[in-house]
Regions:
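Bacterial N-terminal signal peptides that target proteins for export
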Residues: 1-11
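N-terminal signal peptide c-region/cleavage motif recognized by signal peptidases
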Residues: 17-21
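Short, ordered beta-strand-loop transition motifs
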Residues: 55-61, 97-104, 129-137
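N-terminal Sec-dependent export signals
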Residues: 12, 22-24
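C-terminal partner/receptor-binding element of secreted or periplasmic proteins
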Residues: 118-144
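Short, extreme N-terminal segment that most often corresponds to the first beta-strand
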Residues: 25-33, 108-109, 138-144
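N-terminal secretory signal peptides
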Residues: 25-83
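Long, charged/polar, surface-exposed segments that mediate recognition or autoinhibition
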Residues: 67-123
Length: 144
């Protein structure tokens, strides 16, 4: 009986996660590294998909914005944990205490292994850099 209950729970969790991804907003088209941080972040905020206040600002001025509660964003089929960006002299972004990473930079942090993410990004023809963050957490980043 316990085995059947575990299977049912696993099935329910799997179906729930698939349902969430079915209603996800894909944003990989904007990760072509030809935009600015403002052009990447502002439409997501105006659509009500992304928080307007960063959850964190790094010393290098990279701002981390969470998707709003109930919103699911994806990039190359991977669920987006956070959108990261900075653009100099733009009121959407708060400066950090150190030297800014660039005049404009943007990207996402996704739930996925770096090798799998890098493969999908390359296959899509994007110029984005892929960076390992932690096990199964990967950054996709553009500095146009």
């Amino acid at each position: 009986m316990k085995h059947i209950a575990r299977i049912r729970i696993a099935l329910a969790v799997t179906l729930a996660s698939l349902a969430a991804l079915a209603h996800a907003k894909p944003i990989e088209a904007q990760l072509d590294c030809k935009s600015t941080a403002h052009d990447f972040v502002a439409p997501l905020q105006q659509s009500g998909l992304l928080e307007t206040k960063p959850m964190r600002v790094e010393p290098n001025s990279v701002n981390a914005f969470k998707p709003v509660k109930g919103a699911t964003l994806t990039a190359y089929g991977f669920k987006v944990y956070v959108v990261v960006a900075y653009q100099k002299d733009d009121p959407i972004f708060r400066p950090g205490k150190g030297e800014p990473i660039a005049d404009s930079a943007y990207g996402v942090v996704v739930w996925g292994g770096d090798a799998e993410v890098a493969e999908k990004v390359k296959a899509a023809g994007s110029d984005a850099d892929v960076h390992h963050v932690a096990p199964f957490i990967t950054a996709i980043f553009c500095k146009p």
